């Protein structure tokens, strides 16, 4: 024979049941004691007509304006009297002294000297020893009056000498020039050892002179050294060889 023991409920379940029961009891209590307020009966509405002039606020009374006090005019300053102008002092210029008249120079009287009478010389009697033949000049006098013969050096004869070309820069600037050149002539008649001795103006005509002299030709078989020529450039575009 077995006995049935009552089952034990877990404590979380009991706690939940207690909380719910408390909430239900509270709701019941508040619903019983709640007072229901009825709305008040409607009352009639009264309307009063008011004019807009009554609603305007009263204007503030402005105080009367204060009288404007005009400032007293300032006294005008008394004019300062100007000092009397002094009369300009006139300085009298001294009168120029009259220049003394130059005294006339005394004219020296030229005393005329008495002319001396020149008596003609009496003719001298011819001496028998004088020679009436004309005097011949001595040999020393003749040698002094005669000019010695100057020997003209014979150099190479030029066959063709082309004129140098006028530089375009000098022609544009309208500049004339002069170049002095020293050179040698070989036995074949060619020019070599060209040296510029002077050039006016410098660095203007030298290159054209050297280029032209390379084409010069002289007579073969007659060499020469230290020959000097002057080349003058004119504004008309020509060159003169001296």
Swiss-Prot record:
Comp. bias regions, Acidic residues: 69-79
Is rRNA-binding one of the keywords UniProt gives this record? no
Q: Membrane side Periplasmic: which residues? A: 33-242
- Annotated region 7 X 2 AA approximate tandem repeats of K-P: the residues are 93-106
Q: Where in the cell is it found?
A: Cell inner membrane
- Repeat sequence: residue ranges? 70-71, 72-73, 74-75, 76-77, 78-79, 80-81, 82-83, 93-94, 95-96, 97-98, 99-100, 101-102, 103-104, 105-106
UniProt cross-references to SUPFAM superfamilies, sorted A to Z: TolA/TonB C-terminal domain
According to its UniProt entry, the protein's GO biological process terms are: bacteriocin transport; protein transport; siderophore transport; transmembrane transport
Carries keyword Protease?
no
| Basic and acidic residues biased stretches | 108-119
Task: Name the residues that span the membrane.
Answer: 1-32
Q: Name one Pfam family in it.
A: TonB_C
Q: Where is this region: Disordered?
A: 55-166
Where in the numbering of this chain does the TonB C-terminal domain appear?
Answer: 151-242
Region annotation (7 X 2 AA approximate tandem repeats of E-P) maps to 70-83
Indicate, by first and last residue, each region the UniProt record lists as having compositional bias (Low complexity): 132-153
**GO cellular component entries:** outer membrane-bounded periplasmic space; plasma membrane protein complex
Q: Which GO terms describe its molecular function?
A: energy transducer activity
Q: What does this protein do?
A: Interacts with outer membrane receptor proteins that carry out high-affinity binding and energy dependent uptake into the periplasmic space of specific substrates such as cobalamin, and various iron compounds (such as iron dicitrate, enterochelin, aerobactin, etc.). In the absence of TonB these receptors bind their substrates but do not carry out active transport. TonB also interacts with some colicins and is involved in the energy-dependent, irreversible steps of bacteriophages phi 80 and T1 infection.
Q: What NCBIfam families has UniProt attached to this entry? A: PRK10819.1-2, PRK10819.1-4, tonB_Cterm
What does the sequence similarity comment in the record state about its family? Belongs to the TonB family.
Q: How does it assemble?
A: Homodimer. Forms a complex with the accessory proteins ExbB and ExbD.
Q: What is the protein name given in its UniProt record?
A: Protein TonB
What would be the name of the gene that encodes this protein? Answer: tonB
